[in-house]
């Protein structure tokens, strides 16, 4: 009943292949200090956003005495906390959505083809790693990168696919799409 153990090299290679599908962006790096009996001990804190550019994205926070180690820890934490966000046509949001964390508030709006990513700082990193191509975002309140990223994730978690909405309402997805296109044409006139 003894199971054969694969060599570690193969485990490492499969892990590297899995990690190669992700794109990571460093959002913020801070120098932090811990006060100890002999004075201050300095370290670094990193905030990293990771995504596969196909609708999965996550963020992580890591602290260490050296910058590369803090970034590595943050990247690993981000890969453990991935969420899936349904995208319309693989490029934008299905509907407008608000998010909030602490004093940071964000408004995310779907956009037409060719609009691009109109967002500042930390939000842009989230959208690029998510694989979103057209979105308009506005942040108000706190401009702290940690709050902005968490508020953006709060908004993205509230993104609902129209198929789920149709199922909740007990109607067919095609009916919902027809209503959506009819209301879209009426607003353009």
Curated annotation (Swiss-Prot):
Citing just one GO molecular function, the answer is: rRNA binding
The superkingdom of the source organism is Bacteria
Q: State the family it belongs to.
A: Belongs to the universal ribosomal protein uS5 family.
Report keywords, A-Z.
Ribonucleoprotein, Ribosomal protein, RNA-binding, rRNA-binding
Entries under SUPFAM superfamilies matching the protein: dsRNA-binding domain-like, Ribosomal protein S5 domain 2-like
Indicate yes or no for the key word Ribonucleoprotein. yes
Domain S5 DRBM span(s) in chain numbering: 22-85
List, alphabetically, the InterPro entries matched: Ribosomal_Su5_D2-typ_SF, Ribosomal_uS5, Ribosomal_uS5_bac-type, Ribosomal_uS5_C, Ribosomal_uS5_N, Ribosomal_uS5_N_CS, Ribsml_uS5_D2-typ_fold_subgr
Q: Which residues form the signal peptide?
A: none
Pfam families cross-referenced by the UniProt entry: Ribosomal_S5 (PF00333), Ribosomal_S5_C (PF03719)
The UniProt entry, under PROSITE patterns, shows: RIBOSOMAL_S5 (PS00585), S5_DSRBD (PS50881)
What Gene Ontology cellular-component terms does the record carry?
small ribosomal subunit
**What role does it play?**
With S4 and S12 plays an important role in translational accuracy. Located at the back of the 30S subunit body where it stabilizes the conformation of the head with respect to the body.
Q: What is known of its domains?
A: The N-terminal domain interacts with the head of the 30S subunit; the C-terminal domain interacts with the body and contacts protein S4. The interaction surface between S4 and S5 is involved in control of translational fidelity.
Q: What is this protein called?
A: Small ribosomal subunit protein uS5
Self-association state and partner proteins as the record states: Part of the 30S ribosomal subunit. Contacts proteins S4 and S8.
Could you tell me the Gene Ontology terms of the biological process aspect for this record? translation
